[in-house]
Regions:
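Hydrophobic, aromatic-enriched, well-ordered structural segments
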Residues: 1-219
Length: 219
């Protein structure tokens, strides 16, 4: 039972829509004390469907934990040496990522945008689109999601994945294909190769040896 509750919790946490969340949370309620605890914590603190704002699919603090791991030995050094190690690390990361962005040949970042969008292009091929009006379209997904509503004026889909990720979901992709609209135009600029390059365009310079420092006389 414990493993099942963990599975339902993970599915509930990652659900995009309230309806999908409720489906999994009802199963968690079989353990009343677990459901009560999760409700007291606040659904918006752990549920994607209830969260405020957009987290772009990020659900953990792995970035902070990864940096702590990289600096685990440097953290034992004096503060000046620790700062030097952090700067050297940033120099290395910025250089490597700028090179990756320069060599990128796709419109979107390969792993976080392009790969997802291409998979959704394949999924969209089996969907039927019905025009409701000039802005809204019903999309029939015969595989999983049933009928969903896409609104291009508000850049929204009733599955909510488009709004939260800022990347076209498979239903929006299907509508773009139906209208012969470039699907890449619906992706947030934060996924683009240009933004990736701009993010790492500046240079970070390592600290020079102490003997080369230009220290003002009044310091």
């Amino acid at each position: 039972m414990r493993d099942q509750i963990l599975m339902y919790f993970e599915k509930a946490a990652k659900s995009y829509s309230i309806a999908e969340f409720d489906c999994h949370f009802r199963k968690i309620k079989r353990k009343e004390h677990v459901a009560q605890y999760l409700e007291e914590v606040g659904l918006h603190n752990w549920s994607r469907a209830h969260m405020d704002g957009r987290r772009y699919n990020v659900m953990t603090t792995n970035i902070a934990e990864s940096i702590n791991s990289v600096l685990r030995f440097a953290r034992m050094m004096p503060v000046v040496h620790l700062i030097g190690e952090i700067i050297n690390l940033l120099v290395k990361w910025f250089t490597e990522r700028h090179e990756l962005a320069l060599n990128c040949t796709t419109t979107l970042c390969p792993n976080f945008g392009e790969k997802k969008l291409r998979n959704r292009l394949e999924d969209a091929a089996r969907m039927n689109v019905v025009k409701v009006n000039n802005a809204q379209f019903n999309v029939l997904d015969g595989y999983m999601d049933g009928l969903v509503l896409v609104d291009l004026t508000n850049n929204s889909c009733s599955c909510r994945k488009f709004q939260l990720e800022q990347l076209p979901c498979k239903h929006v992709v299907a509508v773009c294909r139906f209208l012969k609209v470039n699907v890449y135009s619906k992706a947030s600029r934060y996924y683009t190769r240009k933004t990736w390059m701009d993010a790492y365009s500046d240079s970070i310079y390592p600290i020079q040896p102490h003997g080369m420092w230009d220290i003002p006389e009044d310091v």
